Amino acid sequence: MVVYADLLQKMLTKNRAYEINKGKTKELFDYWMEKCKKLVNKSSIKEFKQSIFDIVSDFEKIEIDTSVIKPKVGIVGEVLIKYHPFGNNFVADKLEQEGAEVILPDFMGFIKFIATHKITFNKLIKTDAIKAKLFKTAIKLIDLLEKPVISCLLYTSDAAD
């Protein structure tokens, strides 16, 4: 679900900043959030990859106006501050109202950071080698899950970002 959430968040913030018909991006985001909740429980790898393609394709259909490039503003800090509107006092909404394109880091990146930290910690103080191998396996699995997302995003209209 985290891979879906990261992709949907990325598509939401990118499109919402430039959408011509206000509200269409959020409407599509909500539709895909509900659909992804169902897909998580019963989809195969093939269906997962197809759904990633479908999400990107649907968001690409939203009319946007990029004639005026907006400043990109990243939200950083503790996890709750970055991702939860109540935790950051709705800063993303305020930034968008001021004409910015909000950039949020992928949550999966945070998970990979934690796993990498555990591996490094193991190397430095020689703790449980089995746990280190589990974290390495987790990173490989994350990379495997993110691969179709990265592939799809390479072919979007904003691939340079």
Label each region the model flagged.
Residues 1-157, 161:
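An N-terminal assembly and electron-transfer interface module characteristic of large anaerobic redox
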